[in-house]
A protein has these predicted regions:
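TPR/TPR-like (Sel1-like) alpha-helical repeat modules
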Residues: 164-173, 206-212, 216-221, 248-264
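Hydrophobic face of amphipathic alpha-helices that form TPR/SEL1-like repeat modules
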Residues: 1-8, 37-44, 73-80, 109-116, ...
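Canonical positions in the second alpha-helix
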Residues: 25-26, 61-62, 97-98, 133-134, ...
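Terminal, low-structured helical/coil segments at or just beyond the last alpha-helical repeat
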Residues: 245, 257-292
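Short helix-capping/linker turns of helical repeat alpha-solenoids
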Residues: 8-10, 28-31, 44-46, 51, ...
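Start-of-helix register in tetratricopeptide repeats
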Residues: 33, 69, 105, 141, ...
Length: 292
């Protein structure tokens, strides 16, 4: 297709306007691929002025011919209300068609619809199943959400180690948002907490790879993302709890920072650490803060 050649610069200088022109010619002749690509041009403003209504028009024509990519985008338009009135039921209808053809984007968004009950009855098991299908295709966002399913037991048996496995796969595929570092460090802390409950020694935990990894991911997050707010600042509590096994002074510093940010439950963590510090050393710092 000439449009693809100009769009990708395949043997010719890249030219999105020329690509859109050739897509239009083929689309007018009923080519479903060209109709999809022309819709995408309008959706993203590639080679033409962005126009959601025209995007929907061409996505619809292509989707009616069974094009899975167009079906996904048409479903997304209904889901977001872009170029057409928001309609969750219609969104699900088109996402389902695309998902059945193996479109990973559609499987992921359809899973979210089932998870939230948008256009369908809420069904966490079906959501987890769809996230799994997309995740198996390497879809980074689906892998992140599948990690969440394993972390919280949403529609699937809770398994913190599988959660971490899928979080890491998501990162391998380019998902580098703050919440994935936050999630990994918190799940590792949960694993450490379970280790302590079954009698693992303090010294063994302090030397564990789980502790080292938890600190590594959490410290990366605070150094590379804006966590200086009450919502995301809970990662400082995670760091404080992790450092409880390694360095009480640093644990106290992180807990105090969480308190300063107004993080929920930070005061409880700080008091617990001050009690521990009063038991194991630095009694002056313990006494100065325990009655705050």
């Amino acid at each position: 297709m000439l449009g693809e050649i100009y769009s990708g610069g395949l043997g010719v200088p890249e030219n999105q306007e020329t690509a859109a022109k050739w897509y239009r010619k083929a689309a007018m002749q009923g080519n479903d691929g060209a109709q999809y690509y022309l819709g995408e041009c309008y959706y993203l403003g590639k080679g033409v002025a962005e126009n959601d209504a025209k995007a929907v028009k061409w996505f619809q024509k292509s989707a009616d011919q069974g094009n899975a990519d167009a079906q996904y985008y048409l479903g997304e338009c209904y889901y977001l209300g872009r170029g057409i009135a928001e309609n969750d039921a219609e969104a699900v209808k088109w996402l389902q068609k695309a998902a059945e053809q193996g479109n990973a984007d559609a499987q992921t968004l359809l899973a979210t619809c089932y998870f939230r009950g948008n256009g369908v009855l809420e069904d966490e098991r079906k959501a987890a199943s769809l996230y799994q299908k997309a995740a198996n295709q390497g879809h980074a966002e689906a892998q992140y959400w599948l990690g969440n399913c394993y972390r919280f037991g949403w529609g699937i048996k809770k398994d913190p180690r599988k959660a971490i496995e899928w979080y890491k796969k998501s990162m391998d595929n380019g998902y580098y948002e703050f919440n994935i570092y936050d999630s990994i460090s918190f799940v590792l802390y949960d694993i450490i907490f379970e280790m302590e409950k079954i009698g693992t020694s303090f010294q063994k935990i302090a030397r564990s790879k789980e502790l080292a990894e938890g600190i590594q991911y959490a410290e990366y997050a605070i150094n590379h993302f804006d966590c200086e707010n009450a919502e995301d600042g809970d990662i400082y509590i995670t760091l404080a709890e992790l450092y409880r096994y390694k360095n009480l002074d640093r644990a106290l510093d992180y807990a105090e920072h969480a308190v300063a940010l107004g993080v929920e439950d930070a005061n409880e963590t700080l008091k617990s650490l001050r009690l521990a510090n009063g038991t194991f050393g630095n009694i002056g710092r313990f006494l100065s803060g325990i009655f705050d």
